[in-house]
Amino acid sequence: MNKISFVVPIYNEEENIRKLVEEIQAVAPDLSNDYEILLVDDCSNDGSLPVIRELKTQIPQLRYLSFARNCGQSAALYAGFQAASGDVIITMDADLQNDPTDLRQMYQHYGEFDMINGWRFNRQDTLSKKIASKIGNFVRNWMTKETIHDTGCSLKIMNAEMLKNVRIYKGLHRFLPTLMRMEGAKVIEVKVNHRQRLFGESKYTNLQRGIEGFYDLIAVRWMQSRHLTIEVKEEK
């Protein structure tokens, strides 16, 4: 049985953390009896870290990392990936918009596929965010030759060994399906539920995402063009 690491970046999600951990605990035993919940606090300036510390005293499976300064979502994810002890890594946002119950359906594909990417088919976001996402995914797929509808969906299941070989720079967490394929991963997309945010606020604006995403896209396209694919026919 695979050990599963749930890796969740945290930034100013004080009101959501307890419910988040409860929902993960409710679904985790259906996937594996061996699991850990790894929360990565990106130097939150609210009460997130005290909540995490309290939960740590109550839940044996919970671990956490706390950054000395704010480093961003990509850094939080990368640190979590490297610290995770599981064979399988599952990611999600801390804002409760992802629904962990979808993991039961998604995990059925693991083994045949090395990465299962969620697709927020019916997004509970503003119209402007939906439009920006559709444009972003279209341009991204056109340039990278990808077919994933929703690379920005944080609900993902990934082979840990492959994932730890991926070099993640600032912003490149948005391109994980492409980066995992470069490691030889088989990737599938599964429709998932998407819920409205109840507490807190989004940490990004559409303009910020668009500008950063464009430069990140150029970087990933360059990485694809320089990637070495070697297939040994014979060795004696």
Model region roles, listed by residue range:
Residues 1, 145, 169-236:
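Hydrophobic helical membrane-anchoring modules
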Residues 1-127, 161, 187-190, 230, ...:
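Structured catalytic core of nucleotide-sugar glycosyltransferases
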Residues 7, 53, 78-81, 107, ...:
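Conserved protein kinase catalytic domain
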Residues 19, 47, 105, 130-134, ...:
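Generic alpha-helical secondary structure signal
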Residues 26, 30, 54, 58, ...:
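Conserved amphipathic alpha-helical interaction elements at protein-protein interfaces in regulatory
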Residues 70, 126-129, 133, 170, ...:
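Short-chain dehydrogenase/reductase
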Residues 82, 156, 173:
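Residues that recognize and position ribonucleotide moieties
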Residues 111-151, 156-164, 215-222:
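Short, flexible, basic/aromatic active-site loop/helix in glycosyltransferases
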